[in-house]
Amino acid sequence: MQCWIRQTINFFRKTKNTEKLTALLQQKEDILAVEMPVSLVYNGISHAVMMCSPNNLEDFALGFSITEGIIDKPEDIYGIDVVEVCNGIEVQIELSSRKFMALKEHRRNLTGRTGCGICGTEQLNQVYKTFPKLDCTFQFDLNLLDSCLIDLQKNQLLGCKTGATHACAFFDLYGNMLAIYEDVGRHVALDKLLGWHAKSGKPRGFILASSRASYEMVQKTVACGVEMLVTISAATDLAVTMAEKHNLTLIGFAREGKGNIYSGHQRLHN
């Protein structure tokens, strides 16, 4: 399904004449990102509705299922079907009977904001999840980060068209981009990438995201065993606390030649 549409809109522009600046109302063609409700249905029962870009939904279903603790590994899912319905899209996921029984014990309704997995959590203690502390299995040369930032920028094809999407990319330890996903929701873009990561055998490397580092972005990264998260924007205090607790390398405000290292500096060298 196409992730953008063309639409004629009105816009204004100030033009300079001999006396003053005058705002002129004109028409032009704009490109809009498609945002669509996507229902995740496990063994016939609707579990969550998220607002997403309507692409790479199999990877989204896999990544969401792992980061939400519904499954432990891709093999816990027997099949995924993407079905267009009148008001959106259903992603029909067939779970193993053991995982489906566990899901029914911890059901919640997430219908809410764009790509926000914590919205709709019924109990506060469900928000603060604990995972095993990440091992330190590599060191990354910070001199490679500049080229990674360039690759992230030039490969945001949907974002370049619409200006309305987030991107999450995965890089190996040599600075090669292995995958990139875009979505109107930053958490959804990350879930799509983490779905790819799981089915690709969990390669070593790091995530580079065009958004800020929220608590949930850190939580999803840790849940999938990725040791390093780099974001273009800032980190929140809770994200830093979560990163420190679980030994995640977290970098924010990543720019050419600089960035803020919030935690996990032991994985970095120059």
Swiss-Prot record:
GO cellular component, one term: cytoplasm
Xref: InterPro entries: Cytidine_deaminase-like, FdhD
Pfam families: FdhD-NarQ
MF term (GO), any: sulfur carrier activity
Protein keywords: Cytoplasm, Molybdenum cofactor biosynthesis
UniProt binding sites for Mo-bis(molybdopterin guanine dinucleotide): 253-258
Gene Ontology biological process terms in this record: Mo-molybdopterin cofactor biosynthetic process
Places the protein is found: Cytoplasm
Record bears the keyword Nuclease: no
Catalytic-site annotation from UniProt: 116 (cysteine persulfide intermediate)
Function (record text): Required for formate dehydrogenase (FDH) activity. Acts as a sulfur carrier protein that transfers sulfur from IscS to the molybdenum cofactor prior to its insertion into FDH.
Record-linked PANTHER family: FORMATE DEHYDROGENASE, SULFUR CARRIER PROTEIN FDHD
Record-stated family: Belongs to the FdhD family.
Identification of the protein by name: Sulfur carrier protein FdhD
